[in-house]
Amino acid sequence: MAILVIAEHNNAALAAATLNTVAAAKAIGGDIHVLVAGQNVAAVAEAAAKVEGVSKVLVADNAAYAHQLPENVAPLIAELGKNYSHVLAPATTNGKNFLPRVAALLDVDQISEIVEVVSPDTFKRPIYAGNAIATVQSSAAVKVITVRTTGFDAVAAEGGSAAVEQVSGPADAGKSAFVGEELAKSDRPELTAAKIVVSGGRGMQNGDNFKILYALADKLGAAVGASRAAVDAGFVPNDMQVGQTGKIVAPQLYIAVGISGAIQHLAGMKDSKVIVAINKDEEAPIFQVADYGLVADLFDAVPELEKAV
């Protein structure tokens, strides 16, 4: 039994989500191969070869794969994937984009966002915004799976010495083109990789008030997130959204400020190791999942906390 893991990367560096996905592959059992598809990805392939538990790295270096356009990447993965028992990818924007197409090309059902491996054909995944866990069994010859990375502890990034093999695949399908992207520059950690996250909700009242969270986050070395209510209100951009329809995080410390705790938000952060809630409404649902709660006006509490840090 061999498992193909699709590497998450930016053509320059291997993303941490790949390490969690390899951990899921190890739980399944079998030889683990990693596919690095992109442009000028030698450094990524080198990093993937060092990952604990990986026995082979497949490298598809082609301009057609540079931006992970699903119309180009999916046929490549499907062509390679038919020789494996499992194809795994992190449940990231890219993974959620191309892997359903891979499943369709292989004529199998996809299993989405697993958080536990029961056996090589049986997996657990959250449903109902994380309020229930479904056990799913697949009889497909090739099991196509996205992995919720917060469900698996990352394997070591060093210690492996996998063989590296060049592969080729279908060229540019010509069905879509990459136009451009705007990258937000920040000295703060990336939201899904941060060990500490400070998030604000509707209680922040406006975007300008997020500056008190930024001040606290900078002292803690934390990333800053937001609830959907704050994003929908235009307080902050949607790349800061934590929740079922945003980013899934599981930091060592999650500080929820002015967040009521709708189930959609809880689905994105309830696996955090320690949850601290600050809200003036003592009946707010967020207190039901918080390890520590402070019933207070956030505009008094957060500046005091920032001064004390």
Curated annotation (Swiss-Prot):
Chain positions recorded as FAD binding sites: 253-281
Listed GO biological process terms: fatty acid beta-oxidation using acyl-CoA dehydrogenase
Co-factor binding comment: Binds 1 FAD per dimer.
Top-level taxon of the source organism: Bacteria
Pfam families: ETF, ETF_alpha
Keywords for this protein: Electron transport, FAD, Flavoprotein, Transport
Necessary cofactors: FAD
CDD domains, alphabetized: ETF_alpha (cd01715)
Molecular-function GO term, any one: flavin adenine dinucleotide binding
Functional note: The electron transfer flavoprotein serves as a specific electron acceptor for other dehydrogenases. It transfers the electrons to the main respiratory chain via ETF-ubiquinone oxidoreductase (ETF dehydrogenase).
Protein family (similarity comment): Belongs to the ETF alpha-subunit/FixB family.
Subunit structure: Heterodimer of an alpha and a beta subunit.
Name this polypeptide is given: Electron transfer flavoprotein subunit alpha
